[in-house]
Amino acid sequence: MLFASRPSCFKRLLIVEDDPLVAFDNERTLKHGGYDVIATVDSGEAAVAMLADKTIDALILDLKLAGHMTGREVARLARDRGVAVLLVTGQCPEDAGDIALACLTKPHGAAALLHAVRAVETMVCKHKMPRKVSGMQTYWRPEAA
């Protein structure tokens, strides 16, 4: 079964996505995968407010957002607060290692999103390189942990 509840060191996720259909699908997929999605927001400003007010373990973040803030700005703030960042965007930037652990390219399926989140979880919680995920670029390096 693809969607199953399982123990996780990531308890609370925040999704930042400006496309309503993608946001809905991502939220549903992650909730069915056993994650607690505390909110889904469409702008950097809303994301920063959630980061300031809530305990968040990981950020699922598009780089293109509604509002005036860029995804890179949000990722940098999240990283500075110790929040793991998985970029989910149309084209993964080569130079995002300073703001994210990995990037999943859109479009993606439900299984790819779950595998990508679990891969980031492996990096953060087990301090080891995860299995390769189709469509995902990894920035994290074990020696950096």
Predicted regions and their residues:
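Active-site residues of response regulator receiver
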Residues: 62-63
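Non-catalytic signal-transmission and effector/linker regions of two-component phosphorelay proteins
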Residues: 1-12, 109-145
